[in-house]
Amino acid sequence: MHATELNTGHGSQRAIRLAPSILSADFARLGEEVCAIEAGGADLVHFDVMDNHYVPNLTIGPLVCEAIRPLVSIPIDVHLMVEPVDALIPLFAKAGANIISFHPEASRHVDRTIGLIRDHGCKAGLVLNPATPLGWLDHTLDQLDLVLLMSVNPGFGGQAFIPGVLDKVRQARARIDRQVDAGGRPVWLEIDGGVKADNIAAIARAGADTFVAGSAVFGAPDADGGYSSILYRLREAATVT
């Protein structure tokens, strides 16, 4: 892992994690692309799964996850934008996912879905769209490993960051910090959508520690085809004091 530490002012250091989204990668060279982001310093591979039902787009499934799993040692962070969600969880766990996140609207029983992810040996995340209230965390935060806040409406890459989500990030960070201060489990706070070098510092200051970036990474390769430079710039910008 390449995560760097961020001084939060909350009495502890908070790691910064970068999770390039392969939705923006060159799919004709996907194996090379995931190897390049790991070599460039990525902490996670973000894997967007869309079903043309929960969101109006269709992407990739467990076979692709299984194909890239032997190529990288960093965790695969699977974001399920599918409905219903439960049937796919065992398939992605078997394919090598380390983290599986889902949208509460896509589950009939959110608590059961979280348990299903954990039962299959993966870390569990809950994804909240820009208009989905943080109230979903009231009875789930103590079971989660990750909260993923969408800063665009899910379905397509390359969208612009919604600035109003920053206040939601601050509120989610406060909830997580209260849980940790009370002796509860730490939870990663991930942001996905429109993350770029010119806004990642503001997002980090609001409290995010894990950053999904698609076109910002894969649209800025080095001359040798790698991604070390852009990942370094993103990490430096996110490491605010």
Swiss-Prot record:
Catalyses which reaction(s): D-ribulose 5-phosphate = D-xylulose 5-phosphate
Broad EC category: isomerase
Pfam family, one: Ribul_P_3_epim
Keywords: Calvin cycle, Carbohydrate metabolism, Isomerase, Metal-binding
Cofactor remark from the record: Binds 1 divalent metal cation per subunit.
Cofactor: a divalent metal cation
Enzyme Commission identifier(s): 5.1.3.1
Origin: domain of life: Bacteria
InterPro entries for this protein: Aldolase_TIM (IPR013785), Ribul_P_3_epim (IPR026019), Ribul_P_3_epim-like (IPR000056), RibuloseP-bd_barrel (IPR011060)
GO biological process: pentose catabolic process; pentose-phosphate shunt; reductive pentose-phosphate cycle
Active-site residue numbers: 48, 192
Sequence positions that bind a divalent metal cation: 46, 48, 79, 192
Ranges in a coiled coil: none
Pathway annotation: Carbohydrate degradation
Gene Ontology terms, MF aspect: D-ribulose-phosphate 3-epimerase activity; metal ion binding
Residues bound to substrate: 21, 79, 155-158, 192-194, 214-215
Function noted in UniProt: Catalyzes the reversible epimerization of D-ribulose 5-phosphate to D-xylulose 5-phosphate.
Family assignment from sequence similarity: Belongs to the ribulose-phosphate 3-epimerase family.
Protein's name according to its UniProt entry: Ribulose-phosphate 3-epimerase 1
Organism of origin: Cupriavidus necator (strain ATCC 17699 / DSM 428 / KCTC 22496 / NCIMB 10442 / H16 / Stanier 337)
